[in-house]
Regions:
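Flexible, low-complexity linkers/stalks enriched in Thr/Pro that connect modular domains
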Residues: 4-16, 94-105, 192-206, 311-317
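Short, solvent-exposed loop/edge segments of extracellular or virion-exposed proteins
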Residues: 18-30, 108-119, 141-142, 204-216
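Acidic, low-complexity Ser/Thr/Gly/Pro-rich repeat segments typical of extracellular/periplasmic
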Residues: 49-69, 138-167, 202-316
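A short glycine/threonine-centered beta-strand motif
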Residues: 37-41, 126-131, 219-235, 392
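Beta-sandwich strand segments
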Residues: 1-3, 87-93, 184-191, 238, ...
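Conserved structural position at the C-terminal beta-strand
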Residues: 82-84, 180-182, 292
């Protein structure tokens, strides 16, 4: 027969050759990441391990595929195989191990900024659930390192102005915040720094009571000092045990060679005005001065400059006790008068001639006060023989 010509055909037993071109970034917060590989043949793509994709055809050259959505995890078993048009499968191409992380760091405050504070570069401590890079918002920056080195650690930073170097000015700060971005690029929710006040101004003495150069002060008068701003209560102290000049609030009649002992520590209802009471009472007709030492500090920790009254104040020259030939009278701190002894001529001022104080039960609170009139007080008293006189405040 005539020769039959067989149609031309090609035998191909060569499998495609694959190589990795652009691996998946690791760490990444992209849970549908891209991956680029090259193939020397076109064909059909199949996937192995923990990865898959809807991209199932390849070309001769570079091929970029997008993996289907992946959960947060480390992927180290993903493979790609290309089968050419005559069913020759390539060797599986191992995708370089990568990690998906879409979890944002969680921040919490550990130690807030003290407020008020006289520290212009105050510390602030917070906790982060992950390591990462710090960034700052609002009116604050930080001169500290920008990295949180490891998760679950407490991180102490030094706050500055937003340029990350200049100390904070005297002001109130209510808008400062911290954000930590983890290595995968996930930013935390901004952590708001507590509102705090920077105060570097020293307090001053606004007023004293008794006032400087005041006279006729009662020997039982309370001693008060009012400051220009809220004070640290622990720093306003006085001497309650002896006559040494200790404590930051002092009272003296001898230019502070010694000081008056006080009945108790200074008291205050507003941290502005502090009051003490001498124990025993002050002496009559004596000049005293009030001094506040540098040990007193405002609530931010700023020490006051020492303040001493220039002239001081003078206590009353009137001695409150007087005596006649057979009776005695005493002017109490509240301006009332009590008398005891012989009352033959009514010299006790009680409107009768009955002797008083014969028995102990008639003394003290049981001893009647002289009726001076409603709301009227005595300012001085004197007695002699069988009479008593008083100067009244009306």
């Amino acid at each position: 027969s005539s020769a039959l010509e067989v149609s031309s055909f090609t035998i191909d037993t060569t499998a495609p050759t694959l190589s990795q071109e652009t691996p998946v970034t690791t760490l990444t917060n992209d849970n549908t990441p891209n991956y680029t590989f090259s193939s020397d043949e076109a064909g059909t793509i199949t996937y192995g391990g923990g990865c898959s994709s809807t991209d199932n055809t390849s070309v001769n050259g570079n091929n970029t595929i997008t993996f289907n959505e992946l959960a947060d995890n480390t992927y180290s078993n993903c493979t790609i195989t290309v089968t050419d048009n005559v069913s020759n499968p390539s060797s599986p191409l191992s995708v370089s191990s990568f990690r998906i992380d879409t979890t944002v760091p969680t921040l919490s405050v550990v130690t807030a900024v003290t407020t008020p504070t006289n520290e212009t570069t105050p510390d602030y401590t917070f906790n982060s659930s992950e390591a990462g890079t710090n960034s700052y918002g609002g009116s604050c920056g930080s001169s500290s390192t920008s990295a949180t080195s490891s998760g679950l650690d407490n991180v102490t930073i030094i706050l500055t102005q937003p340029d990350n170097s200049t100390a904070l000015s005297e002001a109130q700060y209510a808008d400062c915040s911290i954000t930590v971005t983890d290595p995968a690029g996930n930013p935390s929710t901004a952590l708001s720094v507590n509102t705090f006040k920077v105060d570097t101004t020293a307090p001053t003495v606004s007023s004293t009571s008794p006032t400087d150069n005041e006279s006729s002060v009662s020997v039982s008068e309370n001693i008060s000092v009012t400051f220009s701003e809220s004070m640290g209560t622990a720093s306003v102290t006085t001497n309650t045990s002896n006559t040494s000049c200790s404590g930051s609030l002092q009272l003296s009649s001898d230019s502070f060679s010694s000081c008056v002992q006080m009945a108790s520590s200074p008291s205050s209802s507003d941290n502005l005005t502090f009051t003490v009471t001498s124990s025993p009472k002050m002496f009559y007709s004596t000049t005293y001065k009030i001094r506040v030492t540098t040990a007193a500090k405002d609530s931010a920790g700023n020490n006051i400059a020492q303040s001493t009254q220039t002239y001081g104040f003078k206590t009353s020259v009137t001695f409150p006790m007087t005596a006649g030939s057979a009776h005695s009278c005493y002017m109490l701190d509240n301006g009332s008068v009590k008398c005891w002894g012989s009352n033959t001529y009514g010299q006790l001022g009680l409107g009768n001639t009955t002797n008083q104080g014969v028995n102990s039960s008639e003394m003290g609170d049981n001893l009647d006060a002289v009726d001076l009139g409603s709301g009227i007080k005595a300012t001085a008293i004197a007695a002699g023989g069988n009479h008593t006189c008083a100067i009244l405040d009306n």
